[in-house]
Amino acid sequence: MANRTEDRKQVRCSFCGKSQEQVRKLLAGPGDVYICDECIELCYEIVEEEFDDDVAESASGINLLKPKEIKEFLDQYVIGQEEAKKVLSVSVYNHYKRVLSEKDLDVELQKSNILMIGPTGSGKTYVAQTLAKILNVPFAIADATALTEAGYVGEDVENILLKIIQAADYDIERAQYGIIYIDEIDKITRKSENTSITRDVSGEGVQQALLKILEGSVASVPPQGGRKHPHQEFIQIDTTNILFICGGAFDGLEKIVEARIGQKSIGFNAEIAHGQKENIGDLFRQVLPQDLIKFGMIPEFVGRVPVNTALDLLDEQALVRILTEPKNAITKQYRKLFELDGVELVFEEDALKEIAKRSFERKTGARGLRAIMESVMMDSMFKVPTDTSVLKCIITKESAEGKEEPRLVTAENGQQRKIAQKKVAKKSSNEIA
């Protein structure tokens, strides 16, 4: 009996070696293996720390730059819109600083989604896309006009989240740190300020449905998209750390702002209207929450996009800069395409001004530049690869106007061009092999 008691006293933790008398609890496992309460607690802490590290690793892929560095990167790709770039740089930095420091904070920081207001073609989508590229986070674009309230024909708001999951290659942890840009947000305003007995399923109903995911909640997303039904499996995603950027042209909002600040329009003079259009960015910068509510946004929605920024209407000078200055400028892209065929492409200054003028007159902004450029370049892109005597293609003002074809400079001897083409052809044949 004494020996049995002595053996029991000698039982020790198999991990730390402490005896039963030195710990509060000693649990027995198979094969005379024991673990004490202190080692259990230590194991729990290690597992929890590794789990937190895994979550942090998903977020650690975020390339968080300082606001000034973010703006400097934006400057390489986005022409003009200085105020908007500054506001977005600060807001995005604060959002991801909150995300990366969340477990170390003793004060809960609420996320600040962003509302961008600006005319068509002012660069709203492009700015949001460039921000995601800077930060190395998944990015998805959703069209608010396709959304309807649950139970009606159209897309559920959860389908927006499926797009960010797909952008992250179904890596849910990574998707939860992404950026979602909701375009045409001004098209889901309620139809009337007065309460109606009929449901507004594509206006106020969509705004109501968006509230939860904007604020942060765990949403159930159908993996194949479409409508939910009770017998399908769902993907769970937490939207707390997803940054939502909403954008829209908000046509007519400037009149609400004018009425509030006391500016009056006199008569129907077209010149006055044109002057107001040039000043539309300044008016949008004075937008207050009550202006958005009067426009048709519900107060709860306005409260969930607290950061507002305005983008200016791009004038002809800005459009010329967009054609030439950014790292991925359209003219640089076309020059590279011609260079691959061994041809030098030259744009005359007057030609660029004409292309910018046509885009400005069409009121398509930066978005319309590529379509115009494509029509100007089409004949040359069709002929030049075949005609090996062409060394240079010059886009003149007349060719930009569509009055004549681009000027082609040919060599008396096509040898130089043929050598360049042989290199390309050789590379292509090797790739095929």
From Swiss-Prot:
Q: What is this protein called?
A: ATP-dependent Clp protease ATP-binding subunit ClpX
Give the record's GO biological process terms. cell division; proteolysis involved in protein catabolic process
Q: Where is this region: Disordered?
A: 402-433
Q: Which InterPro entries match?
A: AAA+_ATPase, ATP-dep_Clp_protease_ClpX, ATPase_AAA_core, Clp_ATPase_C, Clp_protease_ATP-bd_su_ClpX, ClpX_bact, P-loop_NTPase, Znf_CppX_C4
Function, please?
Answer: ATP-dependent specificity component of the Clp protease. It directs the protease to specific substrates. Can perform chaperone functions in the absence of ClpP.
Q: How does it assemble?
A: Component of the ClpX-ClpP complex. Forms a hexameric ring that, in the presence of ATP, binds to fourteen ClpP subunits assembled into a disk-like structure with a central cavity, resembling the structure of eukaryotic proteasomes.
Q: Which family does it belong to?
A: Belongs to the ClpX chaperone family.
What are the entry keywords? ATP-binding, Chaperone, Metal-binding, Nucleotide-binding, Zinc
Gene Ontology cellular-component annotations = HslUV protease complex
Q: At which positions is Zn(2+) bound? A: C13, C16, C36, C39
Q: Where does ATP bind?
A: P119, T120, G121, S122, G123, K124, T125, Y126
Extract one GO molecular function annotation from the record. ATP hydrolysis activity
Membrane-crossing residue ranges in chain numbering: none
Note the Gene3D superfamilies from the entry: 1.10.8.60, ClpX chaperone, C4-type zinc finger domain, P-loop containing nucleotide triphosphate hydrolases
* Annotated gene: clpX
- Extract the signal peptide range: none
ClpX-type ZB domain location is: 1-55
- List, alphabetically, the SMART domains matched: AAA, ClpB_D2-small, zf-C4_ClpX
Q: Which superkingdom is the protein from?
A: Bacteria
